Amino acid sequence: MQRLMLKSKIHRATVTDADLHYEGSISIDEALMEAADLLPYEKVAIYDVNNGERFTTYVITGKRGSGVICLNGAAARKVAKGDLVIIASYVIVDGEEAKGWKPTCVFVDPENQIKH
C-alpha cells in the first residue's frame, strides 16, 4: 500500500506580496526552497493561517536571501500581504517507509529567514 505523506513544509512564512497580474504560482526565496527540498514547478499546498484559505499552486524560484513569499495570479486573491502561511509539499511512499517517515520542517522568522 502507498500513502501520501507530508514531504516538507515552510511553517508560518509571512506573505511579502501578492501579484494578481503575474503568471499563477508562488515565488519562494531560493534558500527556503532548498531548505524545504522544493523544486521549480513543484505542486504545493498553501494554508493561510490568518483567513483559513487552503489551495494549491506551483513553485517558482525567488531571489535567494530576499525572504520573498509572493502569491501570483489567481492565488493572489486568497491572501493578503502580511498573512502567515504554511507551504506544504507531499510525496507518495510505500507503507513500510511511511511507518518511520519524518518530513522536513523549515521554521522562519518574521522576515522569512531560516531559524537555526
Curated annotation (Swiss-Prot):
Residues binding substrate, per UniProt: 57, 73-75
GO molecular function terms listed in the Swiss-Prot or TrEMBL record: aspartate 1-decarboxylase activity
Mod. after translation: Is synthesized initially as an inactive proenzyme, which is activated by self-cleavage at a specific serine bond to produce a beta-subunit with a hydroxyl group at its C-terminus and an alpha-subunit with a pyruvoyl group at its N-terminus.
Enzyme class: lyase
Pfam families: Asp_decarbox
Cofactor binding note of this UniProt entry: Binds 1 pyruvoyl group covalently per subunit.
GO annotation, biological process: alanine biosynthetic process; pantothenate biosynthetic process
Catalytic activity: L-aspartate + H(+) = beta-alanine + CO2
Family annotation (HAMAP family): PanD
Protein name, as recorded: Aspartate 1-decarboxylase
Natural source organism: Syntrophus aciditrophicus (strain SB)
